[in-house]
């Protein structure tokens, strides 16, 4: 283990106050067999949080009891404890979760979890990787040089299975184990990058770590990000013996240590937040006041520009939730195809253990390891722009994987992939950055939805995920997710029903969050206007509206009716007509109401069809037209006609009122004048008198 120039003080020196990592090897610890049985994170987790048997992430510890892994009192037998997971510890067939946080590229799962890509990771070039033109800020050591990893450690012969750094084309590498069904993301890579062979069906990547384990022929094709050629992909991180990394001062956790950061579980840290000061990345300080996020605060949730701390709204308990973020990379079930955490812009091709790794307190613009592409992320699978922090890549459905339950952080249920959570509309075709088309990325079968947190803004929606300031409902315990209020207008997720993980009573899956009143949308229901049957006292108002209508039809001179006539004929023992009245609230009126419309009707008879409802007048004051009042009145009239056994409704429209003609026609009314050739005639009183008295 020749680590020239690299300071690797053990974890004990890592300034993480309060973090006692009894059994954990120094970051750089080259774990030959990766057999880190009980390298428990013991107290590595949040202060007071004991994770006794916490197996290195990625390391499938069947039978290990991860009692307090991230969730106090939570037993997670048999779980893939992602947490603190040591990327390199992936089990056989565990698809290469690859890529961890920016700067912390943990391609080869080799880097034991704690590895914190120290602030000085920048400019670390991976020897052997031809990064033509690929400037990887904080260039993750392709070899999984995540932070504390042993810069000089070189794993001879180990072909770097899981590095997948954007732009790194690893031709010929066929990552066994990735088994990425249907992963096929033709144009997934950044614009111009073509990843033809990304398919990786049925491959089984055997413990990529094991130095010297060079798996001949095993080339990691998937992660291969076109652009960078890694001819031999030999670059296995773990043992980079000669890989001196100039300037990479990796004093294990100590240098990379962020003051005040308790890196209890891999979570939190994993949250690569561009421009985000991850000062208190640890769950502890990370939690807002009163916020208990035992399981890992929304790690993985990319919150550009937001402080992790605010991620959790004060008082909000998020116990045991897959806080999308940081979806325990290591937690992926065996055979789970490379989900790619992909945190917006944080291309995380593989579930790389980004957790512990925090590249410097400030991870500004550190795009995920390997993802040096500013803005582009995760060629391979990652839903560009999807910001689907956490493994949940809507479009990425992994075939057959099921992840039942919400799986609390760290509690990855091996083999299960959150079935119930299936993210509706996973298919988000145009989510990726312009030009990047993720066709085929669908990965049928896997309904990986978990990560989807309501509050989590999907494609294009910034929604600093869980932090919507002001959006938080303090004290609202949403185990699992922050659903930005039911009516978060800006949050509306196009087509994405943003299913909520387990928001009891909080948000209904599939429910779009605009409020019922759609903010700004005119209320056209009864809370704005009321429609009722007219009473005797309404006669003056009815007369006023009749005159307005007559004036509109240029027939005001023909108006002879009085309020007394209306009272006598419409409100006696045998009414000759009936009226519906439309009112709106008006505080200036003594009654508090203003009559803005009416409909006068009566019943007649047709010798061919029977009873008919005849609509004599139908009018809404012009200032209140267009609010749905007329449509509601027409609906009421139709209901009356049906309940009174009428077979049709007749009415007249003046010939020059084309707007009304068009409206009624669009609703299905027939113009009998043209359809059947009828003419409406009328005898006035004089003619009636003449006829009545003629001899």
Curated annotation (Swiss-Prot):
Q: Where is the composition biased (Low complexity)?
A: 105-122
- What's its top-level EC category? transferase
Which domain of life, per UniProt?
Answer: Eukaryota
User: Which segments show compositional bias classed as Polar residues?
Assistant: 1-39, 52-68, 78-98, 123-179, 197-208, 231-266, 294-310, 355-375, 389-422, 459-471
Q: What is its EC number?
A: 2.3.1.-
Record's Pfam families?
Answer: Acetyltransf_1
Q: Which residues bind acetyl-CoA?
A: 618-620, 626-631
Keywords annotated in UniProt: Acyltransferase, Transferase
Region of interest (Disordered), ranges: 1-274, 290-332, 344-375, 387-493
* N-acetyltransferase domain ranges (all copies): 529-695
GO MF annotation list: acyltransferase activity, transferring groups other than amino-acyl groups; spermidine binding
Q: Where does substrate bind?
A: 552-553, 650-652, 676
Question: Which GO biological process annotations does it have?
Answer: spermidine acetylation
**Listed PANTHER family:** DIAMINE N-ACETYLTRANSFERASE (PTHR10545), SPERMIDINE_SPERMINE N(1)-ACETYLTRANSFERASE-LIKE PROTEIN 1 (PTHR10545:SF63)
UniProt similarity note = Belongs to the acetyltransferase family.
Question: Protein name, please?
Answer: Spermidine/spermine N(1)-acetyltransferase-like protein 1
């Amino acid at each position: 283990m020749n680590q020239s120039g690299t300071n690797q003080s053990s974890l004990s020196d890592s300034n993480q106050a309060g973090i006692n990592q009894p059994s954990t090897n120094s970051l750089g610890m080259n774990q030959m067999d990766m057999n880190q049985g009980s390298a428990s994170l013991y107290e590595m987790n949040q202060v007071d949080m004991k994770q006794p048997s916490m197996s290195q992430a990625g390391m499938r510890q069947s039978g290990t009891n991860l009692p307090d892994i991230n969730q106090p009192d939570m037993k997670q037998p048999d779980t893939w404890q992602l947490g603190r997971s040591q990327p390199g510890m992936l089990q056989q067939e565990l698809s290469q979760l690859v890529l961890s946080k920016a700067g912390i590229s943990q391609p080869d799962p080799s880097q034991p979890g704690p590895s914190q890509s120290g602030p000085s990771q920048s400019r670390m070039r991976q020897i052997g990787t031809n990064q033509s033109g690929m400037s990887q800020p904080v260039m993750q050591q392709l070899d999984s040089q995540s932070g504390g990893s042993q810069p000089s450690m070189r794993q001879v012969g180990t072909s770097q299975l899981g590095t997948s750094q954007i732009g790194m084309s690893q031709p010929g590498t066929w990552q066994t184990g990735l088994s990425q069904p249907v992963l096929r993301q033709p144009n997934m890579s950044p614009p111009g990058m073509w990843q033809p062979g990304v398919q990786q069906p049925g491959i089984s990547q055997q413990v990529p770590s094991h130095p010297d384990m060079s798996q001949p022929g095993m080339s990691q094709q998937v992660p291969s990000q076109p652009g960078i050629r890694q001819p031999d992909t030999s670059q296995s991180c773990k043992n980079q013996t000669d890989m001196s990394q100039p300037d990479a001062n990796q004093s294990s956790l100590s240098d990379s240590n962020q003051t005040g950061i308790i890196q209890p579980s891999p979570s939190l840290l994993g949250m690569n937040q561009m421009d985000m000061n991850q000062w208190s990345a640890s769950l502890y300080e990370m939690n807002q006041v009163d916020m208990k996020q035992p399981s890992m605060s929304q790690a993985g949730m990319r919150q550009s520009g937001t402080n992790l701390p605010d991620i959790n709204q004060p008082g909000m308990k998020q116990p045991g939730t897959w806080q999308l973020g940081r979806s325990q990379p290591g937690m992926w079930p065996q055979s789970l195809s490379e989900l790619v955490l992909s945190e917006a812009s944080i291309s995380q091709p593989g579930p790389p253990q980004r957790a512990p790794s925090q590249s410097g307190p400030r991870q500004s613009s550190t795009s995920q390891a390997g993802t040096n592409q500013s803005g582009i992320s995760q060629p391979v699978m990652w839903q560009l722009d999807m910001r689907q922090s956490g493994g949940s890549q809507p479009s990425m459905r992994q075939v057959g994987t099921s992840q039942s339950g919400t799986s609390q952080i760290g509690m990855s249920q091996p083999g299960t992939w959150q079935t119930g959570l299936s993210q509706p509309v996973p298919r988000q075709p145009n989510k990726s950055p312009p030009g990047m088309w993720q066709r085929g990325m669908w990965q049928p079968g896997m309904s990986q939805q978990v990560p989807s947190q309501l509050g989590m803004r999907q494609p294009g929606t910034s929604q600093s995920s869980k932090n919507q300031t002001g959006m938080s409902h303090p004290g609202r315990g949403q185990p699992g997710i922050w659903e930005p209020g039911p009516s978060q207008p800006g949050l509306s997720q196009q087509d994405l029903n943003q299913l909520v993980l387990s928001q009891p009573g909080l948000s209904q899956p599939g429910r779009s969050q605009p409020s019922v009143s759609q903010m700004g949308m005119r209320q056209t229901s009864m809370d704005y206007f009321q429609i009722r049957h007219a009473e005797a006292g309404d006669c003056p108002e009815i007369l006023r509206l009749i005159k307005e209508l007559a004036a509109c039809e240029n027939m005001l001179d023909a108006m002879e009716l009085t309020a007394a006539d209306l009272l006598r004929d419409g409100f006696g023992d045998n009414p000759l007509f009936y009226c519906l009245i439309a009112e709106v609230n008006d505080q200036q009126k003594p009654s508090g109401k203003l009559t803005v419309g009416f409909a006068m009707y009566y019943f007649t008879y047709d010798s061919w069809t029977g009873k008919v409802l005849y609509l004599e007048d139908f009018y809404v004051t012009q200032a209140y037209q267009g609010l749905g009042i007329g449509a509601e009145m027409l609906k009421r009239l139709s209901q009356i006609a049906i309940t009174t056994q009428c077979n049709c409704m007749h009415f007249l429209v003046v010939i020059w009122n084309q707007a009304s003609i068009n409206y009624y026609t669009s609703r299905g009314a027939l113009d009998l004048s043209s359809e059947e050739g009828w003419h409406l005639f009328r005898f006035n009183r004089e003619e009636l008198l003449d006829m009545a008295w003629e001899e």
